[in-house]
Amino acid sequence: MERLSGCRLRPWMLLLLLFPVQGRQKDSGSKWKVFIDQINRALENYEPCSSQNCSCYHGVIEEDLTPFRGGISRKMMAEVVRRRLGTHYQIIKHRLFREDDCMFPSRCSGVEHFILEVIRRLPDMEMVINVRDYPQVPKWMEPTIPVFSFSKTSEYHDIMYPAWTFWEGGPAVWPLYPTGLGRWDLFREDLLRSAAQWPWEKKNSTAYFRGSRTSPERDPLILLSRKNPKLVDAEYTKNQAWKSMKDTLGKPAAKDVHLIDHCKYKYLFNFRGVAASFRFKHLFLCGSLVFHVGDEWVEFFYPQLKPWVHYIPVKTDLSDVQELLQFVKANDDLAQEIAKRGSQFIINHLQMDDITCYWENLLTEYSKFLSYNVTRRKDYYQIIPRRLKTEL
């Protein structure tokens, strides 16, 4: 005991003490050994991150800025602006200026809120921020140019930033969220209240999904639900592009369901949409087990969420989904432990302060690569802080 007391526990050991893996006691010949072994390996390799100074995400900033270590020249920036790959912003003497054009004004407003929150601590700089759904800088593009986008795949060099949706700007879901999901700090409180009303033991053990057909990758789950409704309750809802029942796989569109009502279910599915799905972070706060389909599209906080530690990874074609659902139903304690870790990560590391902190760190580091002094464009206007938004 004396020797043990003097040993330094590695982070993964501490994690196992906090969240013991019940499955470790199962027979090695268990039907579910493959999945249990994956969980054990994931926990052994997992390094919990600090809550200080949003340090969880420093690696993301470093990786995204690596292509620009040779410097960002005035000529390079002029080319980005000329191509109109996003909205051009300038920060000069702690004031924010912008060109008049913005494709989605509410999205720009959501971005501007966070920049204005930290602008007193930022040096002069300029940047192009893309508020479209899709990234703009494929890796084959030469030269690599700096464009900020909220989401990307490994095939892009875009610099990720926390999406406008943490404050405002959609996506609109009629009639539940006509102006978007609203402020993240307020919505998370609603979700946590709902989670408290639906503890694990009271949740429905049918897997659940409601969403529009923004990607055909969602089809197999809808079809499985029609075949086995006790296993999965999944239906398509309408979106702005809906024209006929063909857009909901031959069935009438289901009604939209408020995200707080998702908390009634143990197992919740997340799919990509056009890009990364905005629902992902919300699902964890239900205290439910998140099934994350595919790993291609990411936002800035995704890399620190680990498969088998915080969520159940599902193949893009959903070929493994039935077996995974059978596994979690047969190993309820394991499922609950993963759900707890996922929920705690979002609670601890994706607070509004973390979003603001990320913006500050990102822009501060980015500014170091500008190889010239920024000159204000005369036709740009100053963005003034607006009155605090509190509506959902």
UniProtKB/Swiss-Prot annotation:
It is found in: Endoplasmic reticulum lumen. Glycans are attached at residues 53, 204, 373. Pathway: Protein modification; protein glycosylation. One of its GO terms (cellular component) is endoplasmic reticulum lumen. Pfam families: Glyco_transf_90. It catalyses: L-seryl-[EGF-like domain protein] + UDP-alpha-D-xylose = 3-O-(beta-D-xylosyl)-L-seryl-[EGF-like domain protein] + UDP + H(+); L-seryl-[EGF-like domain protein] + UDP-alpha-D-glucose = 3-O-(beta-D-glucosyl)-L-seryl-[EGF-like domain protein] + UDP + H(+). Dual specificity glycosyltransferase that catalyzes the transfer of glucose and xylose from UDP-glucose and UDP-xylose, respectively, to a serine residue found in the consensus sequence of C-X-S-X-P-C. Specifically targets extracellular EGF repeats of protein such as CRB2, F7, F9 and NOTCH2. Acts as a positive regulator of Notch signaling by mediating O-glucosylation of Notch, leading to regulate muscle development. Notch glucosylation does not affect Notch ligand binding. The active site is at 133 (proton donor/acceptor). UDP-alpha-D-glucose binds at residues 177, 212, 218, 274-279. This is Protein O-glucosyltransferase 1. Belongs to the glycosyltransferase 90 family. One of its GO terms (biological process) is regulation of gastrulation. It comes from the Eukaryota. Keywords: Developmental protein, Disulfide bond, Endoplasmic reticulum, Gastrulation, Glycoprotein, Glycosyltransferase, Signal, Transferase. A motif (Prevents secretion from ER) lies at residues 389-392. The keyword Glycoprotein applies. Residues 103-107, 172-178 are annotated as: Interaction with the consensus sequence C-X-S-X-[PA]-C in peptide substrates. The record marks 132, 240 as: Interaction with the consensus sequence C-X-S-X-[PA]-C in peptide substrates. Residues 1-23 form the signal peptide. Disulfide bonds join 49-56, 54-357, 102-108, 263-286. It is an enzyme of class 2 (transferase). Its main location: endoplasmic reticulum. Its EC number is 2.4.1.376, 2.4.2.63. GO terms for molecular function: EGF-domain serine glucosyltransferase activity; EGF-domain serine xylosyltransferase activity; glucosyltransferase activity; UDP-glucosyltransferase activity; UDP-xylosyltransferase activity.
